[in-house]
Every structure is written in C-alpha cells, then in structure tokens.
Regions:
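Conserved active-site regions of diverse hydrolases
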Residues: 21-502
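Positively charged n-region of N-terminal signal peptides that target proteins for export
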Residues: 1-4
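C-terminal motif of bacterial Sec signal peptides marking the signal peptidase cleavage site
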Residues: 15-19
Length: 502
C-alpha cells in the first residue's frame, strides 16, 4: 500500500486559500467568439497521458471528460467547432482486470489516522471500441510511438510493442496513432508529446539508459531516454502527416522539466528525523566506522555526521568509485570479523548521504525506514542505515541527464513550431510559474505544484487534476488566439474538479 501521509493542516490550507490577485481577468460575456484565421470544424488532439485526461494513476471517464483537449473543443464549438469524441473507459475507476499492472485510480483514504493515497481495484476488462475519436491521446506513448505501426495490435502487448490504451480504440491492428488521426481529415490539431521520452527514466529512478546517440528506438527499453534526434524526427513525421491531409494549422507544446513536478519534489532529501540518542547510536555504529576510512581514501564527504533533527537519506550512487574492497580491507585490519567486514564493504562501497541536488521519488515514502529482508540490525533500515537503491532516487547526475535531454527536446519543438507555422505553447515556462512560491491565481484560488495542497496535480504526483488541465487548456487557447487571431474564451479552472477528499 502506498502511504503518502497528508496532514490535516495542509488540507485546511488547501480548502481555505484565497487571494486578491487573479490571472483570469477577462470578462467572457463581452467577447465575440470567432475562429479568426483557423477552421475548428474538425479538431484532433494527439499526445500521451496528459492529452487523454489521465490522472490519479489511472485513466477513468470523469478524468477524460476533463481532458484539456475536451475543454479547448468546448470553446471551439462557440466558433464553428464540431463534435469532439473521446474513447471513454466504461467506469470511473480505471485500470484493467485482465492486464497485469493496470490498477484502478488512487483515492484518498484514512490509513492509520492519516489521509493517504491508495490504489483502487480495477473492475473492468480491456474493452475494444469502434469508430473514430478526436482525442488521440495515448497514456504511456513516447514521441516515436505515435508513428509506430502495430502500436494498437493486441498481439504485441506481451512483448511491449503495443499499448493497451491504443489497443482499445485503434482502427486496426496495423495502424498507427498518426494514421488514425489523419484518417479523420482534421482542419485543426494539437500536439503535446515528448514528456514520456524522459519521464519514464525519471520515475524509474534513472534505472534506464540514456540513448542519446542511438537513433534506433526499436532497441530501447521502456525506461530509456529517447535520443533527441529521434524525438525531433518523430514529431516532424507527425507534422508532415497533418500537412498531407490539409491540417496546416495547429498548436504544439514543449515539455516541462519533469523534475519540477510533485513526484520529485515532495519528499525532502533530509527526510530522516533523529533524536539525540538515535543520532549518537548511528554515529557510533555506522558513520564512526566508515567515515575515517573514507576520509583516508579522500572520500570523507560521502557521509555526514548525524545530528539531532533532520538528516539526509542514505543512498547508493552508482557514479561513485566502488570502494567495497578498500572498506573491507580496512575493517578487517581493524579486527572486524571477515564476514561482517565484507558485508559492510559491499553494502557501503558506493553509499553516500543525499544532498539537495538529489531528488527522492514520491513512491519512496513507503520504503524509507522499512526493514531490509535478511539484513541484521542496525544495518537494515532503508534510507537510514541501508542505502536506498538507485530506483528510489534521482541522483544529481541523473537529474542533469534529464535536464540536458529536456532542453534538447524543447529546442527542437520550438524550431518545428516555427518551421511549420504553428501556434506554440511554452508549457515549461508555465510549470516554472506554477512552481514559484506565489503560484498562479484564478478568481481567488491559488494553484501551485505543491502535492495535493497546490490544486494542480493529482494524487499520482505526475498528472494534473481537472483544474490543472484547465490551466493548461488556457495556455493552448492563448497561443491559438495569438497565432490565428481567434477569440476563443479561456475556461475557468475553478469550475473543474480537484483532489477529492473522503
């Protein structure tokens, strides 16, 4: 069970927050809604989970109804836009009973006296739909998946070449997301893709491979960072495809730095509170044994002397020189039994205390301070006396890899928007604005990137709430209006759903 504890004080602050400032000041009643130079009669949205309305760790009907493309389409209908169809799932829980790993949505429940996000149990099987759908957002899709044939082939699900979310509504087993979008002959399109090309690496704690320089995505694993040229080429193929059916007008967005979202910013690096007695014990049993050895090896700063109050988590950093043999030899020469010396050397050869440059995954909360099976005290406490594995932490070097890839992606996306004459949404800049202490305000309600209390992000810490998607919808609307001289009104984020409390 995932246990992310939310204090009652935080809930009160969420429910009572107000502000005299607002970023939503236009009087909608005075706007004459027009399409300007655009034709909204057939709008198709391409993208990934963010486009589909995915939130709370699942795809469910109410979330889909509050997808940002659905909000945009609603405003387009006031300016000649047509119907906007979505491949709605059959329930408000999400997940699939017949596909392993696809759980139902997260909900807030009281666990041991604290509000905690807990996954639901899926109630529906993977359904197969017919017809065409304006919302072509596919959760989990990377840039190159949009142009991949067989991505909706049920036979490829076990091997990972197909995606069950596209299997649901693909027109055939051999089609691609792009081909099904083209078949609708759109007059206008939106494209927001690229997040997953780096996000899966980040949410896995960097256990994938940075594939920069490898332009063959068929060799990638699911948690790898996509080569920037592969991303740019895939997006160019999508844009050429849209142009080939006459959809020369549209809007494209860049991607936020994924490390700025609550999944990576909620758990602090110094999440270990110690009293005087426990700090002294750990200093004597662990730090005191290792730090002199590390200091002699010129690596004394790997471990910090523990203090009363908040202390850094102990992590494994695979970029560090492995000092297992040196630690083992030093301990043995100091009279430590051979078996214990070998264990300590192996366990702490690449261990260090986390710093503010490391990011702790939201899902790691349930692991910290748990016992490691088969390891004796005092060395068995995850993140305290036993180093957290790489999958639980983004180290500063991994954060840097993500930043470099994101910057490269965004440079290409901006250039492609200019080359194809499209409206451009700077989603990265909006995320930075949301991340500021003041957040942004809409009609007296403040939105930020804070987990749960910020109002923008859902319980999975990665995807948005209905209100968060409304904030994004407005960025698309503003970009469309600026480029095509349309007058689509913005939506009011406060009219959409946020976190639901029990």
């Amino acid at each position: 069970m995932k246990k992310i504890i939310i204090s009652s004080l935080a809930v009160v602050s969420l429910l009572s927050v107000t502000s005299c400032k607002t970023d939503f000041e236009t009087d909608m009643s005075k706007i004459q809604v027009t399409s300007g130079e655009a034709d909204f009669s057939k709008y198709v949205a391409l993208g990934n989970s963010l486009t589909s309305g995915y939130r709370d760790g699942a795809l469910y009907a109410d979330g889909q109804r509050e997808s940002y493309p659905a909000m945009i389409a609603g405003q387009m209908q006031r300016a000649g836009g047509g119907a906007f169809t979505q491949p709605l799932v059959p329930d408000n829980i999400g997940g699939f009973t017949n596909v392993p790993g696809f759980r139902g949505k997260l909900t807030l429940q009281v666990v041991n006296g604290a509000l905690t996000p807990v996954y639901s149990t899926a109630v529906s099987t993977l359904d197969r739909l017919t017809g065409t759908y304006n919302n072509m957002g596919v959760p989990g899709a990377k840039s190159f998946h949009l142009v991949a044939n067989d991505y909706g082939n049920v036979a490829g699900m076990l091997s990972g070449t197909a995606n069950p979310y596209f299997v649901r509504f693909a027109s055939s087993s051999t089609t691609s997301v792009l081909e099904d979008a083209k078949a609708q002959n759109p007059t206008f399109f939106s494209l927001w893709i690229g997040n997953n090309d780096v996000l899966s690496y980040a949410t896995s704690g960097g256990v994938g491979t940075n594939q920069t320089g490898n332009t063959n995505p068929s060799t990638y694993s699911s948690n790898d960072i996509t080569d920037p040229n592969v991303l740019a080429g895939s997006i160019r193929t999508v844009l050429e495809g849209m142009r080939s059916v006459g959809a020369t007008k549209g809007v494209i967005a860049n991607i936020p730095n994924v490390t700025s979202i609550p999944f990576f910013t909620t758990i602090p690096y110094n999440a270990v509170p110690l009293n005087e007695a426990y700090a002294a014990t750990l200093n004597a049993q662990l730090v005191g044994r290792l730090k002199p050895i590390l200091t002699a090896l010129g690596q004394g700063d790997r471990l910090k002397t523990l203090v009363v109050g908040q202390n850094p988590l102990l992590i494994k950093d695979e970029t560090l020189a492995n000092l297992s043999a040196q630690i083992t030899a030093a301990l043995t020469s100091n009279g430590v039994p051979a078996a214990l010396a070998a264990f300590i050397g192996t366990t702490y050869g690449q261990a260090r205390h986390a710093t503010s440059e490391d990011l702790i995954l939201l899902s790691t909360k349930s692991v910290i301070n748990t016992d490691v099976t088969g390891v004796l005290a005092p060395f068995n406490k995850q993140g305290i006396t036993y180093p957290l594995e790489d999958k639980y932490v983004l180290t500063k070097s991994e954060v840097r890899e993500i930043q470099i890839a994101t910057d490269a992606y965004n440079t290409s996306i901006r250039a492609l928007a200019e080359t194809y004459g499209l409206a451009f949404v700077d989603a990265n800049a909006k995320m930075i604005e949301l991340g500021k202490n003041s957040g942004i305000q809409y009609n007296g309600v403040t939105y930020s990137t804070a987990f749960v209390t910020g109002g923008s992000f859902s319980l999975d810490g990665v995807h948005l709430t209905g209100r968060g998607y409304a904030v994004i919808a407005n960025e698309f609307i503003k970009a469309i209006n600026a480029k095509y001289k349309s007058t689509l009104p913005q939506v009011n984020p406060n009219n959409y759903s946020g976190i639901k409390f029990p």
